[in-house]
């Protein structure tokens, strides 16, 4: 998110300060300012602990991040939506688990957008997401 804030300019940081804190799993929208997009949807992913009933609360909150961001995008007539892999950085979600949660939501809404993109940081992340997609596809086909 530091890269996004530095590229967007100080207006984005001020817009976020004006909004204030949001709850884990919630999402809000701001202008894109100096970014090559009309808007930025912000969400707060949970920290993964695995200790709360095997991480169920965290998993549900992670799904909420995607779901709430998508609902805001639909409400604002966004036709292209890009996500990063939420929760996998400092929030410590295992990449496979995060990918599975994200894909369950993203696949449900894929027809709502002209482009629905996930930006991944590395080839190894792409392999994990592709494996998660294959597993989800097999599970839904059965």
Please annotate each region the language model reported.
Residues 1-75:
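Glycine-/small-residue-enriched capping loops at alpha/beta junctions
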Residues 48-142:
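Phosphate/ribose-phosphate-bearing ligand recognition and processing surfaces
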């Amino acid at each position: 998110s530091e890269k996004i804030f530095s590229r967007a300019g100080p207006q984005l940081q001020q817009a976020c300060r004006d909004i204030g804190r949001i709850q884990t799993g919630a999402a809000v929208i701001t202008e894109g300012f100096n970014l090559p997009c009309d808007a930025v949807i912000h969400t707060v992913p949970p920290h993964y602990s695995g200790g709360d009933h095997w991480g169920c609360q965290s998993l549900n909150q992670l799904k909420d991040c995607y779901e709430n961001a998508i609902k805001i995008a639909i409400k604002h007539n966004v036709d292209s939506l890009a996500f990063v892999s939420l929760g996998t950085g400092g929030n410590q979600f295992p990449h496979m688990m995060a990918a599975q949660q994200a894909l369950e939501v993203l696949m449900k809404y894929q027809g709502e957008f002209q482009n629905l993109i996930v930006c991944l940081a590395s080839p190894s992340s792409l392999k994990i997401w592709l494996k998660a997609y294959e597993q989800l596809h097999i599970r839904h086909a059965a």
